[in-house]
Regions:
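Conserved nucleotide-sugar donor-binding catalytic segment
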Residues: 4-61
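Catalytic core of nucleotide-sugar-dependent glycosyltransferases
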Residues: 42-51, 57-84, 103, 107-133
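Short, surface-exposed acidic
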Residues: 86-90, 135-137
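Short, charged, amphipathic alpha-helical segments
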Residues: 89-95, 117-121
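Amphipathic alpha-helical repeat scaffolds of TPR domains
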Residues: 92-107
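Membrane-interface aromatic/basic loop that binds lipid-linked glycans or pyrophosphate carriers
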Residues: 110-172
């Protein structure tokens, strides 16, 4: 993603220091300030996936869950996405947040620790307090319901669904 400097400046973009996963912020925060978008079929950057220490490796992501949660919380606070006038932009931004909430929730559950389950709960409570309409939209959606199935059985069902999705789409 390439943005003109003026777009980044207008958006007030400030990335947290010494934090992984800020590429999500870089793509998300300036987007409402973009007036025109162009697709160029050019590889500006090649990302080799497969190293064990890579930041997108599932085990590494679980180890850095606090950074994932921080980035997600920051993104939740940038805009009241339910009030974005452009319907397509609003839809995209809501979906992006839904994906971020899902990733954070799945990682917390996959970690298997009570501490991270509590952090997941706190993230959803943060969203509820920050933006109730968005919370209701995400929480009652398919992914939100799946991420919050009750009990150990619900968490096992979510992980089974995650593994099936993982095989189908080939991520991590």
């Amino acid at each position: 993603t390439l943005f003109p400097y003026t777009t980044l400046f207008r958006s007030g973009l400030q990335l947290p220091k010494h934090t992984f996963y800020v590429d999500n912020i870089f793509v998300y925060q300036p987007l409402p300030h973009v007036k025109h978008m162009y697709y160029l079929d050019v590889n500006f950057y090649r990302y080799y996936i497969g190293r064990e220490d890579q930041s997108v490796n599932e085990k590494v992501m679980i180890g850095r869950i606090d950074q994932q949660l921080l980035v997600t919380k920051l993104m939740l606070g940038y805009y009241d996405v339910t009030k974005i006038a452009n319907r397509k932009l609003r839809h995209y931004m809501v979906q992006y947040l839904e994906i971020m909430m899902t990733i954070s929730s799945v990682l917390a559950i996959k970690s298997g620790t009570d501490e991270n389950l509590e952090k997941k709960k706190e993230l959803w409570q943060y969203l509820k307090k920050q933006n109730l309409p968005l919370y209701l939209r995400l929480r009652t959606g398919f992914l939100g319901q799946g991420c919050n199935l009750p009990g150990k059985g619900g968490r096992k069902l979510l992980i089974a669904g995650y593994k099936i999705t993982q095989k189908f789409y080939g991520f991590n």
